[in-house]
Amino acid sequence: MIRLENVSYNYPDGTPALRNINIGIKKGEYIGITGKNGSGKSTLALHLNGLLRPQKGKVLVRGMDTGDFSKLQGIRKLVGIVFQNPETQFVGRTVEEDLAFGPENLCLPPIEIRKRVDRALAEIGLGKYRYRSPKTLSGGQGQCVALAGILTMEPDCLIFDEVTSMLDPDSGKAVLERVKRLHEKGKTIVYITHNLEELQAADRIIVMDRGKIVLEGTPENVLSDLSLRYLGLTPPSLIELAERLKNHGVAVPWEKTSSPSSFAEEICRLFLKT
């Protein structure tokens, strides 16, 4: 669905942000992109729907080049971005007006706009706040409104750029659960975060450092890679526990579907066997 070919991009001061990036993202895939601050992951996100355009190489979305200005509207119908701070995306006085903004710019009929707004409100479970100002909502609710505003555009691909970094743990989990449900419904997901705990549901993880891709693979392979700490990243707590147990002669297998409860059950099972 999206292909990056030898993409490079420098900051205005000349510092490289992306260096010769090559990525292919398939329709329906769940991609996690991670790296410490300054690794280039957010700059990469802005390239995926043409908010930034490469200085070298190209980004293709369903064959459309983001460098072709005439294709940008079509590209942005297909690829939507939810940012770290939802308030940067609010344009309406009420939640309902905010959600209607995108479809109105697509010149859709009022009946279709109403259907999309109602559907998006039902998806995020915030129908009772439709007449509230989005700026009066909690951080988690505001992030869900920003997501709903993108959903009214009905994109095939959703990019989430550090969307939980300003949320409390419970709100963050709620947003992650909605991302998971969207993927189950067939949406292509690109989820960007420095928190590796949030990437266990991904099909594939890409690790960036200084504008380059330095690791890529399944969650099982990437999240257990010993080089993560040298890249300034902290492995998920379950993987760290599994590694410590392994060092003491207890091999507990970890999978992307592992939860704290299932992991604890496996440990108990192993000890009961002995």
UniProtKB/Swiss-Prot annotation:
Q: Which UniProt keywords apply?
A: ATP-binding, Cell membrane, Membrane, Nucleotide-binding, Translocase, Transport
How does it associate, per the subunit comment? Forms a stable energy-coupling factor (ECF) transporter complex composed of 2 membrane-embedded substrate-binding proteins (S component), 2 ATP-binding proteins (A component) and 2 transmembrane proteins (T component).
Where in the cell is the protein located?
Cell membrane
In its UniProt entry, what is this protein called? Energy-coupling factor transporter ATP-binding protein EcfA
User: Entry's SUPFAM superfamilies?
Assistant: P-loop containing nucleoside triphosphate hydrolases (SSF52540)
Q: What Gene Ontology cellular component terms go with this record?
A: ATP-binding cassette (ABC) transporter complex
Known EC number(s)? Answer: 7.-.-.-
Q: Which PROSITE patterns match?
A: ABC_TRANSPORTER_2, CBIO
Q: What is its main location?
A: membrane
Family assignment from sequence similarity? Belongs to the ABC transporter superfamily. Energy-coupling factor EcfA family.
The protein's matches in Pfam families, at most eight in alphabetical order, are given as: ABC_tran
